[in-house]
Curated annotation (Swiss-Prot):
Reaction catalysis annotation: S-adenosyl-L-homocysteine + H2O = S-(5-deoxy-D-ribos-5-yl)-L-homocysteine + adenine; S-methyl-5'-thioadenosine + H2O = 5-(methylsulfanyl)-D-ribose + adenine; 5'-deoxyadenosine + H2O = 5-deoxy-D-ribose + adenine
Organism name: Haemophilus influenzae (strain PittEE)
Family the UniProt entry places it in: Belongs to the PNP/UDP phosphorylase family. MtnN subfamily.
Keyword Hydrolase: yes
Binding of substrate, residues: 78, 152, 173-174
Keywords from the UniProt entry: Amino-acid biosynthesis, Hydrolase, Methionine biosynthesis
Gene coding for it: mtnN
Gene Ontology biological process terms from the UniProt entry: L-methionine salvage from methylthioadenosine; L-methionine salvage from S-adenosylmethionine; nucleoside catabolic process
Record-linked NCBIfam families: MTA_SAH-Nsdase, PRK05584.1
Protein name, UniProt field: 5'-methylthioadenosine/S-adenosylhomocysteine nucleosidase
Pathway of action: Amino-acid biosynthesis; L-methionine biosynthesis via salvage pathway; S-methyl-5-thio-alpha-D-ribose 1-phosphate from S-methyl-5'-thioadenosine (hydrolase route): step 1/2
Catalytic-site annotation from UniProt: 12, 197
GO cellular component, one term: cytosol
């Protein structure tokens, strides 16, 4: 089995990259694909760049060139569900775009033509992630993760997203694009991210301060997932 892992930023993939043995590096457009072994397992690690387009370009290259059997999206997210705090884990049951709107033609908010309204995560992967997170003593929230090309940093933005998607747990900028590509290629995926901020007016300061913690927490979970897969 070959395990695919996707993170947007260098800080989000650095821990796993540094654990890779026999590491090779391939650049495709703005994406960097690292391939090697982690604890004896075949792993391909994508540093995609930030945003939906970068994530889609990188994930497409990853699936076509490296052909992983599954994809885990790791990194950080803004926590918008009640009770979430910095360092907590969010795991996707589904992902949706919060900034797509073709409702004028009868589609659901967030749905793009020729695509489902929500991209469903692989249940076995989500179950495994939750089991490991709870075993590690992490606080976990599982459910809907919403993506858009905006860093959410105000209560007004959170209120709008929650009005459209009341069950949203976390917000970020790549997961749904990654999920859409995996859906198109029929590759199972799950999103496993750690909370770096609350999406409010202090989000940018919190993100800068707590990104290393979020990267450490999510990487620890993904590392054990690799061992168990």
């Amino acid at each position: 089995m070959k395990i695919g892992i996707v993170g947007a930023m260098a800080q989000e993939v650095e821990i796993l990259k540094n654990l890779m043995a026999d590491r090779t590096e391939t650049r495709v457009a703005s994406a960097v694909i690292f391939e090697g072994k982690i604890n004896g397992k075949d792993v391909v690690l994508l540093q995609s760049g930030i945003g939906k387009v970068a994530a889609a370009i990188g994930t497409t290259a990853l699936l076509q060139l490296a052909k992983p059997d599954l994809v885990i999206n790791t990194g950080s997210a803004g926590g918008v569900a009640k009770g979430l705090k910095v360092g907590d884990i969010v795991i996707s049951d589904e992902t949706r775009y919060h900034d797509a709107d073709v409702t004028a033609f009868g589609y659901e908010k967030g749905q793009l033509p020729a695509n489902p309204a929500a991209f469903l995560s692989d249940k076995k992967l989500a179950d495994l992630a939750q089991e490991i997170a709870e075993k590690q003593g992490q606080s976990v929230k599982r459910g809907l993760i919403c993506s858009g090309d905006s860093f959410i940093n105000s209560e007004d933005k959170i209120t709008q997203i929650k009005a459209d998607f009341p069950n949203v747990t976390g917000v970020e900028m790549e997961a749904t694009a990654i999920a859409q590509v995996c859906y198109a290629f029929n590759v199972p995926f799950v999103v496993v991210r750690a909370i770096s901020d609350g999406g409010d007016g202090k989000a940018s300061i919190s993100f800068e301060e707590f990104l290393p913690l979020a990267a450490k927490q999510s990487s620890a979970l993904v590392l054990e997932m690799i061992d168990r897969l």
